[in-house]
Regions:
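A phosphate-binding catalytic loop at a beta-strand-loop-alpha-helix junction
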Residues: 125-141
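Phosphate- and divalent-cation-binding pockets in alpha/beta enzyme and binding domains
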Residues: 116, 137-140, 171, 235-236
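Ferredoxin-reductase
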Residues: 4-104, 124, 164-166, 190-194
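Reductase modules of NAD(P)H-dependent flavoproteins
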Residues: 9-13, 157-257
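Phosphate-handling active-site elements
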Residues: 146-157, 247
Length: 257
C-alpha cells in the first residue's frame, strides 16, 4: 500500500505577510524576510524559483501590483524572503527600499511560476546565467539542491554564471561563496565595470567569448536557465542554439520593475 503525497500547503486568495527582518545586501538592494502575520512561519509550500505577486495599496492613488521571485529556499524553514534591488524610476522597488520596515505587512498571492528545476523534463546538469537581481531565483535553486546533488528529483551538477557591475553590487555574495565550495556546484562571477581578475573574478559582460569559456563541454547533458536583461538573455539563447542545444532545454525568466 502506497502513501499519498500530501498536497502542498497554500492559502487561498491574498495573504498578509509581516516583515520580520531586513538585510542590507548592497548599496541599492535589500532582502526582506517575511512570515505569516497571524501564525508566524512561512504559510505555504513552494518550489525554488517561484514568485509571489504583491499588492500595494498605499503607494499611489490606485493599488499597484508587482511580482517578485523568492530569494529564500524551501529548505529554509520558518520564513520566505524577497531580495529587492532599486530600479531607476521603479515605483515599487524604490518604495520598498525606502519605506518598508520591521513589523510592516505586505499582501501576497501565490506561490506562482514554473521557472524551476523539473527533474522530469530537464537534463542532469543545470546551467544558469543571471545578472544583477536576476541572480535571486538561482540563489534559491542552488541553495535548495546543493546538498541533494545526484539524488532523485535533483540535478547531478550545477553551474551558475552571474554578472554584477562591481564588487559593490554583489547580491547574495556570502551565500554564493559558501555554495561554491559544495562539490558539484560551480559558481563563476564576472564584473562588468570593475576589473578584479586578480581576485578571481572574470571581467566583462557574459558575451560569446565568455560563454564559450564557461559553458565548454556542457551542451550534450545540460538544461539552461537565464534571468536578467533582455539583451543578455537573447544573446544567451542565440548562442545555445548555435551549439545545437534543443529549445526545450532553454528556459527564460524576465524581471520587470
Amino acid at each position: 500500500m502506497t502513501t499519498a503525497t500530501p498536497a502542498p500547503r497554500r492559502k487561498k486568495g491574498w495573504m498578509s505577510l509581516k516583515v520580520t527582518k531586513i538585510e542590507e545586501e548592497t548599496w541599492d538592494t535589500k532582502t526582506f524576510y517575511l512570515e505569516d502575520s497571524v501564525d508566524s512561519g512561512c504559510p505555504f509550500d513552494y518550489i525554488a524559483g517561484q514568485y509571489l505577486t504583491h499588492r500595494f495599496d498605499k503607494i499611489g492613488e490606485k493599488p499597484v501590483v508587482r511580482s517578485y521571485t523568492m530569494s529564500s529556499s524551501p529548505n529554509q524553514a520558518g520564513f520566505t524572503a524577497l531580495t529587492i534591488k532599486r530600479v531607476e524610476g521603479g515605483l515599487v522597488s524604490n518604495w520598498m527600499c525606502d519605506n518598508l520596515k520591521l513589523g510592516d505587512e505586505v499582501r501576497a498571492l501565490g506561490p506562482i511560476g514554473k521557472f524551476c528545476f523539473d527533474p522530469h523534463k530537464m537534463r542532469p546538469h543545470l546551467v544558469m546565467l543571471g545578472a544583477g537581481s536576476g541572480v535571486t531565483p538561482f540563489v534559491s535553486i542552488v541553495r535548495e539542491y546543493a546538498d541533494k546533488l545526484g539524488r532523485e528529483g535533483a540535478p547531478k551538477q550545477m553551474t551558475l554564471l552571474v554578472a554584477y557591475r562591481s564588487k559593490l553590487d554583489l547580491i547574495s555574495w556570502p551565500d554564493l561563496l559558501a555554495l561554491n565550495k559544495v562539490p558539484g556546484v560551480r559558481i563563476v562571477t564576472t564584473l562588468t565595470r570593475e576589473d578584479a581578475r586578480s581576485e578571481g573574478f572574470l571581467h566583462g559582460r557574459p558575451e560569446i567569448p565568455m560563454l564559450k569559456e564557461v559553458l565548454a563541454g556542457t551542451y550534450a547533458d545540460s538544461s539552461y536557465m537565464t534571468c536578467g536583461p533582455e539583451a543578455m538573455m537573447e544573446q544567451f539563447v542565440d548562442f545555445l542554439k548555435s551549439q545545437e542545444v534543443p529549445v526545450e532545454h532553454i528556459h527564460l525568466e524576465s524581471f520587470g520593475n
